[in-house]
């Protein structure tokens, strides 16, 4: 069997975790030159023999990586012996997200965050905007005196929404929105940073938020309506000025990314080429991961406990904060043609994430497919500055073309199908 030359047959076992698509667990002899096209044809033929199923599109994993070319080339690259049967796992292909809306703004959109049926955006004209996820503009909010850099929701119910924004004006601002009357009040102006505030993240319980700044500092603040700080001056309370609960020093350049990993642990990424994991109970650094590029964004998945970075090159990188070899890259994802500005894991799909870059493109990835994204999400006419997948139904992104692009993901597409 001359599989090394891309000829002959290979013995395979076909496995799936989706029981409705299972085929008999027996060895199959297939040509070494097969691709996903031929494997799809083969598996669907077996399923038709089994129960008359209609055709389904599948992706195939060989040794935990998506098959993107010929099977023999994949095995050769992995230095896999052809003596034993090869296990191929197949999964139903994730459907391509569909463009839904283009939300027009007056300036660059540098921050987006979706929650429930609402989208919050922040712009370089210093304004915040609220939209429905169906594309209706609800409100423009003024208050900051310099471009917005980051936003996050604190809480949301039928009556009230609360959120935080950060800006190059060196402040974070806490807002309370009355949904019924569509009125917004600034609850507090958070002062303490000495340069622009680049990143923000609200704690899982909604009681605190963290900010990262060009002053290299990480600060933790109360997100409660009454921050309950004993001894705060009457003047500060009446003026709505809020000061940080904790200030953490350790980065040498801008703290461009911050995210709560759990109730007492924070992840930060910086232009100083490092990721840091902070233990708030000790108020110190728990883990440091050195990288070889400035980090523009970082995302931690609570589902798989891995970290992705977007950096000052064309690549995304995957790290495991639990390993003793903290500087070792677990995987590199190739596909963008310019600096990658923003990245975010799915909150519901363990292996999926999205990215946006200076090549004007968003991409949807599976972390088991490092050589190519699953899909390109086209529409932006200029650099992408921020991307969000907080709402499992929608992928939203903002960019230099003054727009927010909204794409329906699988959950929204499934709901559309059910209502037809």
UniProtKB/Swiss-Prot annotation:
Single Gene Ontology MF annotation: ribonucleoprotein complex binding
PROSITE patterns: WD_REPEATS_1, WD_REPEATS_2, WD_REPEATS_REGION
Keywords in alphabetical order: Nucleus, Repeat, Ribosome biogenesis, rRNA processing, WD repeat
Cited Gene3D superfamilies: YVTN repeat-like/Quinoprotein amine dehydrogenase
Chain residue ranges for the region called Ubiquitin-like (UBL) domain: 10-92
GO-annotated cellular components: nucleoplasm; PeBoW complex; preribosome, large subunit precursor
Superkingdom as given in the UniProt entry: Eukaryota
InterPro entries in alphabetical order: G-protein_beta_WD-40_rep, NLE, WD40/YVTN_repeat-like_dom_sf, WD40_repeat_CS, WD40_repeat_dom_sf, WD40_rpt, WDR12/Ytm1
GO biological process, one term: maturation of 5.8S rRNA from tricistronic rRNA transcript (SSU-rRNA, 5.8S rRNA, LSU-rRNA)
SMART domains for the chain: WD40 (SM00320)
Family from the record: Belongs to the WD repeat WDR12/YTM1 family.
Name of the molecule in the record: Ribosome biogenesis protein WDR12 homolog
Organism in which the protein naturally occurs: Drosophila sechellia (Fruit fly)
